[in-house]
Amino acid sequence: MVRVKHLLLIVVVGILFSCRSGEEVSDLPRPYHNLRFEKLPEVWDEALPLGNGLTGALIWQKEGKLRIAIDRADLWDLRSVEEFKSPDHSYQFICDQVLRKKDIAPIQRLIDDRTKYDAAPTKIPAGAIEFNIASLGKVRNVSLDLTSAVCTILWENGAQAHIFVPANEKGGRFFFENLPDTLSPELITPLYEENDAKLDYQPGVNKLTALGYKRGKVEQINPGTLLYQQQGWGDVSYEIALNWKSASGHSLEGEYCVTSKGTWYSEKEGALECMKQTMSNDFNSSLAMHKHWWREYWMKSSISLPDTLLEKQWYLEMYKFAAASRKGAPPICLQAVWTADNGQTPPWRGDFHSDLNTQLSYWAGYTSNHLEESAVFTDWLWKIKENAEAFTRQFYGVEGLNVPCIATLTGEPIGGWSPYSHSPSTAGWLSHHFYLQWKYSMDTDFLKNRAYPWIKEVARYFENISVRDENGERQLPLSTSPEINDNRIDAWFQKTTNYDLANIRLTYTIAREMAEALGLNEEAGYWVRQLSEWPKPAVDESGLMIAPGKAQTESHRHFSHLLSFHPFGLIDVSKGNGNIDLILRSIKNVEMLGTDWWTGYTYAWLANMKARAFEGDDVVRNLHIFIKAFCSPNSFHLNGDQLKAGYSQFTYRPFTLEGNFACAAAIQEMLLQSHTGVIKVFPALSTKWEDVSFRHFRAMGAFLVSASYEGGKIVSITVESEKGGLMKLYNPFTDKITERKMVTGETITFTNKFPMGK
């Protein structure tokens, strides 16, 4: 009966959705975009990922058992760093040690060394559910359907399992059918206490036992219901409730809820109460609502490429983006809702790394028209604002706003290599995302109440922390460029680096634009004057330098010195020959230095730069390397060259997500660019591509753009105005910029027949 109800539900849902236009339906991810394996993955970082921003799951096989690894985004060990209570924990102390004493060892003892033996602060896992599937025999195939975000496992004996993390619930659902015998789940706790498990160690991790927790107890509430309660550090604790029922021994239906206490995102109710609410909807009802959410998500935008590898990867990345970033939940950290399921803390503590990682993780959200998901990042930045301001006063000794570059869920500093964990300009790069959220949405309330107040405080910080040099120009007392020179004393620069300078110049540039948009002309003028007091970027024959007197002379994973070009666009090909030459020299230099010390995200970032330089073939080449060499079979970015094919000397495999979303962003940059204020469609296509299209990509100014490219030519462009305003389009049918004052809701289509639009 359950099976019949399930089939009827699918038919009804299909009929309901078929009322949509055929064009819209065809835009959904297609079967060939799905993840599909012939057997269950046997390594956690190759598992099939499910998630809803708050809770996540990894589906894999461990020691012969089907395993659902459970995660929740706000589960953190937030113990304070005792060393940071020292009066020496200050920017002034670092300046004294570097500039006057020429001795970085005391800094390393204070900020860096503790991370080698202190496991916390860190992201922590929740637990797992396991099923003994030995009686089910051989798996025929395993798939993750992107359209519905449902994992399906088929066995050769006809048994099936369907698993999903509901879009609007706080846990997961599973349904087995055609079982040859009774099957029961087991609730597994993390390895918080020592046992005989063999661990595959990754860099920068600790055993979970190092956290010092007593393992929580699993209690049977009644037949078919289990409750696991785990105390974390301080006030943080969590619960997992698991419920299941069988029908005639041949099917199994169940659900679980995971709740927390003591975090910004915690519920009032515990897991059992949460599950009672969840159980008001059965599996099929929950599945219907879940599919509807994902259907609406996929309707936001779509692409069609002749390169099926890139097309599939884009859909995989946009799937992970929705699974990892959701309104009301924390933003994407290094692994998001897929914390390591191996008895260890996650790579690099699973923290919020803002010298690159968190920023790249949101690049793909804007053009893809997923502003609700991208707003999660700025929502969190606003939430940590008070803590960041307190950190700025304590560490830098000035008023204003900077953010710990390596931070916890609450924005507190974790430490690590001091030049980057305590970078003096992190908030400048983070300000860019307030700018992007505003420009793509044109949300005046957001601009007035969040974006401008945030950026104004960052600008005030830069003014307060700066000093004057012998020429009267402003400089930072001490500067860095992630992650140049690793953790040595020469990782600190006496002249302001191009990285720090890009963050500073961007902050004043967008502060002026925001002030003008709000009619605050006096404040806008002040930001213009402040900007004029800082130096221009350092350049030489190789292009953009790291800092005055320091060129980029060796292979490196981080293009921090090129930030003013990408993503900021302060230097851009649209600004003339001088900029074009500088950009091309800079890109050529990093390529000539080789890829020995690149990671996967380096290739993805370079692909974005190549797109900005309109070099589409190079975009494709770099993204193919990224996907084939640096991603696991489930599409997770593993940093190192997994093929060991010479693409990098790094051949390790710590999983982080930023490279994935940078890859998606590069594909989007090939199809649409609007960072200059002028909309350009298909600016960086491969010369080998004949037929390309995209639907409802978002341009700055809150314009939705759709375009088709057939037989090697642009055939149509449609622009919809969401908020009204002046639209500027590079018109390929006239080879000129077309300007049109649009009203809210207006749509204009440009074709060969109607080159000026209709």
What is each stretch, according to the model?
Residues W298-M299, K320-A322, L360-E372, W429-T444, ...:
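Well-ordered alpha-helical scaffold segments within catalytic/enzyme domains
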Residues R3-I10:
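Sec-dependent signal peptide recognition
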